Amino acid sequence: MTSKLEQLKQYTTVVADTGDFDAIARLKPVDATTNPSLLLKAAALPRYAEHLRQATAGSGGDAGLACDRFAVAVGKDILGVIPGRISTEVDARLSFDSEATLARAHRLIELYDEQGIDRERVLIKIASTWEGIRAAEILEREGIQTNLTLLFSFAQAVACADAGVFLISPFVGRIYDWYKKSENRDYAGAEDPGVQSVSRIYRYYKANGYKTVVMGASFRNLGQIEQLAGCDRLTISPDLLQQLADAQGELPRLLLPGEGEPRQVLDESAFRWQMNEDAMATEKLAEGIRLFARDQEKLEYQLATRH
């Protein structure tokens, strides 16, 4: 029998959630995603020492530019061993500034262009704030495709689809974490709140003819992945990808298009109200932005203090 990983690939595009080049080369995903936390881990790997040196040398003391140059260098390496796309993230500290997000996205695309990488192989990752979604809407009109991340609520998914973004990354595991702690109980299978969130979004998109790709992210266990077999894409850590590669047994498609809610359009006040009413999404979005910003600052410090 084929492994669960090979079976999953029959229904779902498998994406590696890592900046570890060697893991990607071994596990052969179609696409890869990075973020400031993963880049900080990658910076500790010996294979990236030269990229760190070059990123610093070419940035004129601008630590933010050095981070972007390092992210693009890692992305270029990864694109050499995958057939698809790399997702590279905008500085999370710009999450509430549409204009600054646009400027940083344009810079990332220019840096990839300097490396001979076509924009068709790059997704710009942006936090799913109201301001981030508005920036993504403009980028999509410019032909720059986006990946809206830190997505925890149905309201965020509705706004992203209405804006015509290329892809969203709803966070399964972090939703699960919040409910497990808040309700003081564990969840498994179809009862998992993170699984339920992605399933609801997926069916809403399919029922209403949205082209936006749903890519489940942030998994805590194989059960969550198995429940979402059939989702457009799943971005999975190397550890869980390896567990899938080693696992035998049936892996049926459990997520299928079905009845979805009627099409909605949210203006800014309705979006903010629905977010305000969702304690989990409000807390996890704020926490996610803080964590990515902190790791961005750590990476900038590391680059600024290199000798």
From Swiss-Prot:
InterPro entries: Aldolase_TIM, TAL/FSA, Transaldolase_1, Transaldolase_AS. Its main location: cytoplasm. Signal peptide: none annotated. It is found in: Cytoplasm. Pathway: Carbohydrate degradation; pentose phosphate pathway; D-glyceraldehyde 3-phosphate and beta-D-fructose 6-phosphate from D-ribose 5-phosphate and D-xylulose 5-phosphate (non-oxidative stage): step 2/3. Disulfide bonds: none annotated. The active site is at residue 125. It holds the Pfam family TAL_FSA. It catalyses: D-sedoheptulose 7-phosphate + D-glyceraldehyde 3-phosphate = D-erythrose 4-phosphate + beta-D-fructose 6-phosphate. One of its GO terms (biological process) is pentose-phosphate shunt. One of its GO terms (cellular component) is cytosol. One of its GO terms (molecular function) is transaldolase activity. Gene3D superfamilies: Aldolase class I (3.20.20.70). Its EC number is 2.2.1.2. Keywords: Cytoplasm, Pentose shunt, Schiff base, Transferase. Homodimer. Belongs to the transaldolase family. Type 1 subfamily. Transaldolase is important for the balance of metabolites in the pentose-phosphate pathway. This is Transaldolase. It comes from Pseudomonas aeruginosa (strain UCBPP-PA14). The gene is tal.
